[in-house]
Regions:
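C-terminal motif of bacterial Sec signal peptides marking the signal peptidase cleavage site
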Residues: 21-24
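Bacterial signal peptide processing site
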Residues: 26-28
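His/acidic metal-ligating clusters that form di-metal
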Residues: 96-106, 135, 189-274
């Protein structure tokens, strides 16, 4: 009897083939690497902290230095207003041109602006200078004896001058025969007081008004403008002694006095004991300036204020002659410095 081999059905064979294929794939796949384990006694360290430097503290900015400033001082221009208008024209041009470079903040005039205050054409001549800087910087004029008429001695003509309208009514007495103004420069507060020729004699109550003004502004450095105060030798005129006693001596804030009228130049330092302790603690610098003669046409003074040293440099110059003034006999310059002048 012939035996036949048993045969697998097609279905069984297919299942066997599938099983063999799956086993082969499982053997060929790489095993996943086990996660490394830390030793039992190890301690995981925290990340080192990031060092943050503190922001630098900015250095304080240095305090700004106070700025020097200047005033122009004109005086006794009567001869120029009478017959040398070209000199006034050059003075006005120079002042206007130097406003920025010299930091000019005002123009003083200590009187005798014209030769005869009742002649309008002389005021027109002075306008050649005035209109070059008026409206740009303040103009501080006081009347001289020529401005009110040498014989008439009447303020009526002078007080009608238009430039006095630059002062508000409350800052004028006698329609402008006396005035004051306030300004600040170089870190210092100032008051400028203008007292016209014999105004304290002609206008009743002038001394009381002046005293009230200076007392109300006692914390400001006082600059006083007179026409007549002292002569070329530095001596007080007899008729000016009351002004000296009741204005300059009586008010501790007055530090500078400017005047004209007499001939030449002079400087005097006055000392006052304001607190009555027997020691003079206040010094006032008084200056007279009035150069005469054709060789001196057009001279003015530039006053340079230094806020750090508190000094005032005095420069004497003529834009008309384009020269600085020197003593013709000695060759000595008229320029000097007032130490601790304000």
């Amino acid at each position: 009897m012939q035996h036949r081999r048993p045969t697998l059905s097609p279905i069984v064979m297919a299942l066997l083939a599938l099983c063999l294929l799956c086993c082969a794939c499982a053997k060929s796949a790489p095993a996943a690497a086990p996660a490394p384990s830390a030793p039992a006694d190890s301690v995981q360290e925290s990340p080192a902290p990031v060092q943050v430097s503190p922001a630098p503290v900015p250095s304080p900015s240095p305090s700004p230095q106070p700025t020097p400033f200047s005033f122009v001082w004109m005086t006794d221009t009567q001869a120029l207003s009478y017959h040398v208008p070209d000199a006034l024209d050059s003075m006005g041009d120079w002042i206007s041109a130097k406003i920025e470079t010299e930091n000019i903040i005002g123009v003083f005039h200590t009187g005798d602006i014209v030769d005869n205050g009742f002649k309008s054409w002389e005021w027109d001549n002075f306008d050649l200078a005035l209109q070059k800087f008026r409206g740009k910087i303040p103009f501080y004029p006081v009347a001289g004896n020529h401005d009110i008429g040498v014989r008439a001695q009447n303020y009526e003509g002078y007080t009608h001058c238009d430039f006095l309208n630059d002062f508000p009514p409350e800052r004028k007495f006698g329609d402008g025969a006396v005035f004051y103004d306030l300004f600040s420069a170089g870190g210092t507060d100032f008051i400028v007081l203008g007292v016209g020729f014999d105004a304290t004699r002609q206008f009743e109550g002038a001394f009381d008004w002046i005293d009230a003004v200076l007392q109300a502004h006692r914390d400001r450095v006082g600059i006083v403008l007179f026409h007549r105060y002292m002569d070329g030798k530095g001596e007080t005129f007899k008729k000016s002694r009351e002004n000296q006693e009741r204005i300059v001596a009586a008010n501790p804030n007055v530090r500078l006095v400017l005047c004209g009228h007499s001939s030449g130049v002079s400087t005097r330092y006055e000392s006052y004991d304001d607190d009555g302790d027997g020691t003079a603690e206040r010094r006032v610098c008084a200056m007279m300036f009035n150069l005469k003669g054709s060789a001196s046409y057009g001279f003015l003074r530039l006053l340079r204020f230094d806020p750090l040293s508190r000094s005032i440099e005095i420069v004497t110059y003529s834009p008309y002659r384009d020269c600085y003034h020197v003593n013709r006999k000695t060759g000595e310059s008229l320029d000097f410095t007032v130490e601790k002048g304000f």
